[in-house]
Amino acid sequence: MDFSLSEEQTMLKEVARRFTANELMPLEKVLLEREMRMWTDGYTLLPEADHARLMKITQEMGFWGIEVDEKLGGQGLGMFAKTLVVEEMSKSLIGFSHHGFTLPPDAPNLYYLEECGSPAQRDKYVRRYCRGEIDSAMMATEPGAGSDISGLTTTAVRENGQWVINGSKIFISKCDKDELFFICIAVTDKEAPTKRRFTAFILDKDTPGLRIGAEIPVIGAMPTWSVYLDNVRVGDEAVLGEVGDAFIPLQNRFGVRRIELAAHCTGMAERLIQMMIDQANLRKTFGVALADRQTVQNWIADSTIELEQVRLQLYFTAWKSDQGHKDLRLEAASLKIAATEMLTRVADRAIQLHGGLGLSREMGIEYVARMVRIWRVVEGASEIHRMSIAKKLLTDGRTYSPFVAA
């Protein structure tokens, strides 16, 4: 087993590192200042001019569609290469936050389109998506159903050759974007088993009957909205995949997001550990350097151990994705738990080591702590993932070998 990076991957990682240092790090103060005023003054985390400039630079660098097939307008370098870039960018608050700056296209929804989209859907959406001309949002969560998808109540009923969709969704992102389409999950057969109950539909933002509701502020500067579906009528061309077959592709889509989240976590954890090292060597208490305090030494040692364990799991899971393993639900669930809980602990130690400074917005550590708290809930709560992992292992009736590459 070869753990070394290829020459191309090493170069990609270095280019991403320089981009992060030169373009993203200098904008951190702007992000932290605007984040305080998002909900009162209607700010985005980055000024539009800065966001447009970063988009132009990353497009010229070949960072758009890193993992996307070249036939669809991407770079064709795979999930592992994308992971290396996301990890480097996430050492900055700008790249760490999903609402700071992310590389187009949004990988999970793209994977869903690639896996299940018809030729017509790919022609209409995928290429524009890869070029950054259009964005997408997943529309699954409802007021009464989050991690437990079996509780969804939004329905799509066949009527006069069309699908009529009714229901409401909540905590939906990106609704402030003009050029947007949704992947909406709806119940098409209430009596069917969970895995055959749901169908995915592609809905353009301007589809009649689709209404964007109130904005819902949540911690970590993560804007979300309610969305209402009132007799939304679409044809069969809007069905993504097969009728009644959305459950497994949706779980695989979540798996891609969980790999991506883990890369955000490992990148930022590395940044925080370096901040802890710098502060420990700089600061003294009662005449003794923090670096000589055993508690501080333990914090830094434990953080390093935990980071490298998660990073190895992350790289292995991304590699398996590139090898064609489609069902990575178990790996992705385990990875998301490990990564988000690791960063939670590292951020807490970093705050504690920095004392009052750690609590200030100036350092940005408290922002990380708020963001990672969100990630232990979204894309499947940690408790649900633990339950799923245990259920899989306990009911399969086979020898324990969940992560062995076939």
Swiss-Prot record:
GO BP, one annotated term: toluene catabolic process
GO CC entries: cytoplasm
Reactions it catalyzes: (R)-2-benzylsuccinyl-CoA + oxidized [electron-transfer flavoprotein] + H(+) = (E)-2-benzylidenesuccinyl-CoA + reduced [electron-transfer flavoprotein]
Cofactor needs: FAD
Dependence of activity on temperature: Optimum temperature is 50 degrees Celsius.
Pfam families per record: Acyl-CoA_dh_1, Acyl-CoA_dh_M, Acyl-CoA_dh_N
Keywords carried by this UniProt record: Aromatic hydrocarbons catabolism, FAD, Flavoprotein, Oxidoreductase
Pathway(s) the chain acts in: Xenobiotic degradation; toluene degradation
Regulation: Inhibited by (S)-benzylsuccinyl-CoA.
Gene Ontology molecular function, alphabetical: (R)-benzylsuccinyl-CoA dehydrogenase activity; acyl-CoA dehydrogenase activity; flavin adenine dinucleotide binding
Induction annotation: Induced by toluene.
E.C. no: 1.3.8.3
pH behavior: Optimum pH is 8.0.
Family: Belongs to the acyl-CoA dehydrogenase family.
Role: Catalyzes the oxidation of benzylsuccinyl-CoA to benzylidenesuccinyl-CoA.
Record's subunit section: Homotetramer.
Name of the protein in question: (R)-benzylsuccinyl-CoA dehydrogenase
Organism: Thauera aromatica
